[in-house]
């Protein structure tokens, strides 16, 4: 099994989702799928980085109001506001993972400091960018983002500072990895936005961003890679 890498990466053609294709399902095997509207789908070829069951999927997904979660990290508290109206299936899954302790004692494995992509990516217990919860679910993509003024093609929109969104490996492959935007970023609107980072959390993100990306022997001044300031989520708490 070739693990997929869930990333948002910079290519000459533009910002795209990349990842190794998932292997074909063996003949006669059917993954488990929840029978509610979110249809959380088991991914046997990509097992969970940390054991967790499929989320509950009631006939009516809660789609009004907000919920709150706080990430307790070594760089400070990162309070999050989750928007059920904007992305009900995503919020339902995220809260499920929080309540199951999926994010506890995990690192934020990726920092990008490109002029047009400023995000911290978290949510993989393996710390490699290849791990997930052992299931996937559909996109709930934004439709009202302003166009990115720096993009002459008109294909990218602004994911503004403070946005909380899902990383993915292509259409309808959401799992557990998410990213926190610390500076306005230009992205194709292919990433589900499901909430926002509160001001206290943005201050913590700014501290991580100020430390930059950890240098490597191949690149002494990278703009994409592990944060120089190791960022660990000790505990994710639903409020």
PLM region descriptions:
Residues 2-9, 14, 19-239:
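Cyclophilin-like peptidyl-prolyl cis-trans isomerases
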């Amino acid at each position: 099994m070739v693990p997929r890498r869930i990333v948002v990466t910079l290519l000459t053609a533009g910002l795209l989702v990349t990842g190794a294709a998932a292997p074909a399902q063996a003949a006669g095997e059917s993954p488990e799928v929840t029978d509610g509207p979110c249809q959380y789908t088991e991914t046997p070829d990509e097992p969970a980085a940390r054991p967790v069951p499929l989320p509950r999927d009631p006939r009516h997904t809660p789609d009004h109001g907000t919920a709150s979660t706080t990430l307790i990290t070594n760089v400070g508290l990162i309070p999050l506001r989750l928007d059920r109206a904007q992305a009900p299936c995503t919020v339902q899954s995220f809260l499920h993972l929080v309540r199951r302790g999926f994010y506890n004692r995990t690192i934020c494995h990726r920092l990008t400091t490109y002029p047009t992509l400023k995000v911290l990516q978290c949510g993989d217990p393996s710390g490699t960018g290849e791990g997930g919860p052992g299931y996937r679910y559909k996109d709930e993509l934004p439709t009202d983002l302003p166009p990115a003024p720096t993009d002459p093609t008109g294909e990218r929109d602004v994911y503004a500072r403070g946005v909380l969104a899902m990383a993915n490996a292509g259409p309808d492959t959401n799992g557990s990895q998410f990213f926190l935007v610390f500076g306005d970023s230009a992205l194709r609107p292919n990433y589900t936005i499901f909430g926002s980072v509160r001001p206290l959390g943005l201050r913590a993100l700014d501290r991580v961003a100020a430390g930059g990306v950890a240098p490597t022997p191949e690149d002494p001044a990278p703009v994409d890679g592990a944060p120089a300031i190791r960022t660990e989520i000790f505990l994710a708490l639903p409020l």
